[in-house]
């Protein structure tokens, strides 16, 4: 979340609002570090950029799972009114699934060797799993 206040992330938020025709404050998910809201997919994308903006990433899962899993999980948890326990469970599931997808694909080097960024290639599965858990799917 350290990058939430950077100009680069502010530019991402403005560009997405303009491209999607939404105004600042219109939506159900918070842009971290602001008082603005956006539709959940937009907020999750901008918040993911904020996580990664300062290169202070976590390690584990599919290398930097937090940049993908956390924005989706926190946004969905807010939307459904999840408890802290439900949120934490969903985050753990998200990291686990992202890692399993990476391992199933041959590991980090296998993804890197074909030009795929494992964070985005595997993290999306983890984000989807975390959101699905919170939605009780």
Predicted regions and their residues:
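N-terminal core-entry segment
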Residues: 1-137
């Amino acid at each position: 979340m350290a990058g939430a206040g950077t100009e680069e992330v502010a530019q991402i938020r403005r560009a997405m609002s303009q491209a999607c025709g939404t105004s600042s404050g219109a939506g159900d998910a918070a842009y971290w570090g602001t008082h603005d809201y956006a539709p959940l997919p937009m907020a999750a994308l901008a918040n993911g950029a904020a996580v990664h903006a300062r290169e202070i990433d976590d390690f584990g899962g599919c290398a930097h799972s937090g940049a993908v899993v956390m924005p989706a999980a926190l946004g969905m948890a807010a939307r459904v009114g999840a408890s802290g326990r439900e949120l934490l469970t969903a985050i753990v599931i998200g990291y686990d699934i992202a890692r399993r997808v990476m391992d199933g694909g041959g590991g980090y080097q296998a993804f890197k060797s074909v030009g795929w960024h494992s964070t985005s290639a595997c993290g999306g599965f983890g984000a989807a799993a975390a959101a699905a858990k919170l939605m009780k799917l």
